[in-house]
Each structure stands twice: as C-alpha cells, then as structure tokens.
C-alpha cells in the first residue's frame, strides 16, 4: 500500500512538473549563468610579451585552476584581459567578471578589486566564495608578473609586491 501511495504521489508530482527535480539554473544567480553561458575574454596572450602579466592560481580543495592575463599599453593602463579556467561554473563566472572589471584600469585601481565585490556581484553562496578569492588572487598574480617583467626590462632590481599589502587589499 505504501508503494502504491508513493507511486501515485510521484506520478501526481510528475504530471504537475515534468521534471520533479529542480533545474540547476535555479540554484545560480542570473549573473553566474550569464557569465558561464557567455564567458567574456576567454583565451590567452603570449606570456613572453613584456606588456602581458600572467597569473596562475589554484584551489586544492576543489581542483579549480585559473589563469588570468592582463595586457598593458605604454602608459600603464590595462587594455585587454584574457582567462582560461578549469573549474566549476562559479569559477568560470568569477574569471569572466574579473577580466571585464580590470579593463581600462591602472595597476593601482586593479589592486583595489576585492573578492567580496566579485562574490556580491555574482551572489555566490559561502561554499563558492573560494571562486571569487581565486579571481582576486589571479589578478594580483598577473600584476606581480607584469611588474617583475617591467623591472627586469628596465634593468632594475626585481621588486616584488609586498604580500602583506596584497592580502590587506583582499580583506
């Protein structure tokens, strides 16, 4: 009898909703879906270009890997950005948003982008916050790489960005 009642209840549910399980897109904010379905700036630049900074970061807890590259003009403004991400939809969306937000900005402006801003824009749940942290870390790593290339090209001692300063920005 329990089996018949369960079967009737399930069939009744199925007749009201052809898919008794929630559609995955209902679990994500529209901004995540938009950037996942239509990611901006996918690709890469030549990492040996002195005007390109490359940041490669990963999250061991989930296996996400993010490569973000920024291309500068002669005056220190970011003119383009590209990414390649191996990871979940939230990581791809965070990468896409990051590349959009860095364009047209200077190094100083870019270093003010915080993971909390990306997370808020995408309405990421707590379990996905590491995706926005990866995006922020990738931006910082790309800027660090670019500065190291510029210092080396100018014959200067390679100056690294103070990690305390970088972590303070991301807080």
Curated annotation (Swiss-Prot):
Keywords: 2Fe-2S, Iron, Iron-sulfur, Metal-binding, Mitochondrion, Transit peptide. GO terms for biological process: iron-sulfur cluster assembly. It comes from the Eukaryota. CDD domains: IscU_like (cd06664). The keyword Metal-binding applies. InterPro entries: ISCU, NIF_FeS_clus_asmbl_NifU_N. Its cofactor is [2Fe-2S] cluster. Component of the core Fe-S cluster (ISC) assembly machinery. Belongs to the NifU family. PANTHER family: IRON-SULFUR CLUSTER ASSEMBLY ENZYME NIFU HOMOLOG (PTHR10093). This is Iron-sulfur cluster assembly protein 3. It comes from Arabidopsis thaliana.
């Amino acid at each position: 009898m329990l089996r018949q009642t369960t079967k009737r209840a399930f069939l009744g549910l199925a007749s009201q909703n052809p898919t008794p399980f929630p559609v995955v897109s209902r679990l994500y904010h529209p901004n995540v879906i938009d950037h996942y379905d239509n990611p901006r700036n996918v690709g890469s630049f030549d990492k040996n270009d002195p005007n390109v900074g490359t940041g490669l970061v990963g999250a061991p807890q989930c296996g996400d890997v993010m490569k973000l590259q920024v291309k500068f003009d002669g005056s220190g403004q970011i003119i383009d950005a590209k990414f390649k991400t191996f990871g979940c939809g939230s990581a791809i969306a965070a990468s896409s948003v990051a590349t959009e937000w860095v364009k047209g900005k200077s190094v100083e402006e870019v270093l003010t982008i915080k993971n909390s801003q990306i997370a808020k824009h995408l309405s990421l749940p707590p379990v996905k916050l590491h995706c926005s942290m990866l995006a922020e870390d990738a931006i910082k790593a790309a800027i660090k790489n670019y500065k190291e290339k510029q210092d080396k090209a100018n014959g200067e001692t390679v100056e690294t960005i103070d990690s305390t300063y970088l972590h303070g920005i991301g807080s």
